[in-house]
């Protein structure tokens, strides 16, 4: 019997020793996620505006004041340039945590969600605190995974799916005209017809859809350039001009809808370029997929918006 008691005592001593050896007085809990997103986009959706948290939070929430996840309620309590301070609250505790931004390069960041626990001197409390820390670390990881999935989706960030492509039709037959208001569809397609007539007259071929760029000169005057990609360069009269695009890179997005939706696409590409610190060497333009003169319902118009970049 004494031997059994002695063995139990030794086991207890070993267990307690192991607890003190393996669980430090201060337990740091961190989860790190590498996210392919720009610093600007992260700030917009995570730091600058609390309402954007609902868009990526994995459990349903109607408010950003208290974000529930499993057995915790997460509450944003403070923010600065790179850190969001968040209280993780359950029935027993309020744990103060930090969400830290660590930029790596133009389009990649690390996000660290971290906190620390004082485990005390009581072995039982140490084990309980360790289990609590392990659970919270799992929550951090799951929440960061949800954030990563959202932030790496360009369509979620910019409202359009943005892709990179190359200039395939560098040679253009173009013409410009000015109007006192935004050009009408009739005015645009009048010039497109003139270009098409010249293409037939000169016995050359179209290699792509009509292209359009409208520039506001002042509050009531616009300059419009219309172009059609062609297969070879020949001479035209002064009303028409041959333009040569640089064989470089383009951003492109598909747009469905009229002028207002197309302008939103231009704005989204402007923001994308700013976020990714790109430079545009030439003017953006839209490619007219739908023949707008034949389709009066602008909600059915299909276009592509292109932005040259390097």
Language model segments and positions:
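Short, well-ordered beta-strand elements within core beta-sheets of diverse protein domains
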Residues: 29-36
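A structural signal for short, hydrophobic beta-strand segments that form beta-sheets
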Residues: 71-78
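Extracytosolic and intramembrane catalytic regions of membrane-associated proteins
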Residues: 83-85, 96
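Ser/Thr- and Asn-enriched, surface-exposed coil loops between beta-strands
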Residues: 80-83, 105-107
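Hydrophobic membrane-insertion alpha-helices, especially the h-region
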Residues: 4-21
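A solvent-exposed interaction/effector surface
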Residues: 17, 23, 36-39, 43-47, ...
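Short acidic/polar N-terminal linker immediately downstream of export determinants
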Residues: 23-29
């Amino acid at each position: 019997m004494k031997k059994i008691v002695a063995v139990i005592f030794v086991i207890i001593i070993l267990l307690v020793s192991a607890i003190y050896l393996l669980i430090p007085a201060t337990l740091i809990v961190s989860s790190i996620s590498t996210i392919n997103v720009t610093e600007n986009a992260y700030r917009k959706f995570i730091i600058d505006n609390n309402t954007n948290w609902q868009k990526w939070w994995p459990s349903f929430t109607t408010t950003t004041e208290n974000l529930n996840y499993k057995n915790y309620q997460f509450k944003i309590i403070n923010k600065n340039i790179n850190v969001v301070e968040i209280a993780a609250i359950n029935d027993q505790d309020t744990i103060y945590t930090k969400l830290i931004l660590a930029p790596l390069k133009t389009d990649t960041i690390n996000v660290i969600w971290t906190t620390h626990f004082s485990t005390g001197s009581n072995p039982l409390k140490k084990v309980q605190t360790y289990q609590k820390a392990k659970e919270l670390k799992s929550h951090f990881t799951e929440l960061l995974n949800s954030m990563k999935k959202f932030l790496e989706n360009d369509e979620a960030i910019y409202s359009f799916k943005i892709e990179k492509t190359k200039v395939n039709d560098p040679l253009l037959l173009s013409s410009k005209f000015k109007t006192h208001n935004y050009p009408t569809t009739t005015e645009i397609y009048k010039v497109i017809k003139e270009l098409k007539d010249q293409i037939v007259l000169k016995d050359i071929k179209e290699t792509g859809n009509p292209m359009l760029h409208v520039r506001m000169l002042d509050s009531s005057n616009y300059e419009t350039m219309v172009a059609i990609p062609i297969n070879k360069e020949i001479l035209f009269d002064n009303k028409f001009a041959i333009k040569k695009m640089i064989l470089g890179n383009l951003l492109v997005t598909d747009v469905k809808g009229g002028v207002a939706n197309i302008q939103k696409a231009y704005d989204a590409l402007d923001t994308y370029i700013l976020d990714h610190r790109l430079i545009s060497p030439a003017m953006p333009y839209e490619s007219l997929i739908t023949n707008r003169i034949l389709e009066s319902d602008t909600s059915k118009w299909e276009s592509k918006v292109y932005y040259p970049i390097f």
